[in-house]
Design a protein with these regions (language model features):
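Helix-turn-helix
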Residues: 8, 16-50, 54
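Hydrophobic alpha-helical connector segments
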Residues: 54, 68-95, 148, 152-155
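Amphipathic alpha-helical segments used for helix-helix packing
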Residues: 92-113
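Short amphipathic alpha-helical elements of helix-turn-helix/winged-helix folds
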Residues: 12-16, 91, 158
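Short coil/turn segments at alpha/beta junctions that flank glycine-rich nucleotide-binding fingerprints
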Residues: 19-23, 74, 95, 139
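Generic hydrophobic, amphipathic alpha-helix propensity
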Residues: 5-13, 30, 55-59, 63, ...
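Hydrophobic/aromatic-rich alpha-helical bundle segments in the mid-to-C-terminal region
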Residues: 99-104, 137-182
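Amphipathic alpha-helical packing segments from all-alpha helical-bundle domains
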Residues: 64, 111-139, 149-156, 164, ...
């Protein structure tokens, strides 16, 4: 049975991971940042894997909450997609340090479907974008794609990875990075 991580532990876990990286974020360091002891975590059955799963759930919640307004907004698919992609940039910015500190394997465990499942980003992250792509194809403000799920995966990764790189690797402001990735992403999906 998987242990449930007390939500009060997560901010400390994030700090420990951001300070030390996933590989060196021991339970002792996580406990110290969370203001508790390693033994308390141990008694509660909290493992690093349980913490990673709780962080994944937290990120799912963040993305879902950020994309909900674009899903329910009036307007064309293109206008709603722009709103959704801006929201992806905001969430990416809120998690810059965490994403950098996690490393590939833990980050992949959070975001990717198993390779045997088509190699896509997990649907919890991409379904809102896919829905808007379908709506935009229906109202003809966006191109129709043969595989909207795959296109949503491409957009999610294009925005997330490029935005993070421009912010951390090039030192761009959030506004400049958002403007840069959105102009190219939207141009690629807008109908002519």
């Amino acid at each position: 049975m998987a242990s449930v991580v007390d939500p009060r532990i997560l901010p400390g876990a994030r700090r420990a991971i951001e300070l030390h990286g996933w590989q060196d974020a021991t339970l002792e360091r996580i406990a110290a940042e969370a203001g508790t002891s390693r033994m308390t975590l141990h008694r509660r059955g909290i493992t690093r894997e349980a913490i990673l799963a709780a962080l994944a759930t937290s990120l799912e919640d963040q993305y879902r909450d950020a994309l909900w307004p674009a899903l329910t907004a009036p307007g064309t698919g293109r206008a709603r997609l722009e709103q959704a992609l801006e929201a992806l940039c905001v969430v990416a910015d809120e998690n810059l340090a965490l994403m950098a500190a996690l490393g590939d394997r833990p980050r992949d465990a959070i975001f990717h479907e198993p390779p045997g499942d088509g190699g896509l980003t997990r649907a919890t992250f991409t379904e809102p974008v896919e829905r808007i792509l379908r709506d935009g194809a229906a109202d003809e403000s966006l191109r129709a794609f043969e595989d909207p799920a795959e296109t949503a995966t491409v957009l999610f990764n294009l925005i997330g990875w490029t935005y993070r790189h421009l912010r951390t690797g090039h030192g761009w402001t959030p506004e400049r990075a958002t403007r840069g990735v959105l102009s190219i992403a939207l141009e690629g999906v807008t109908s002519s």
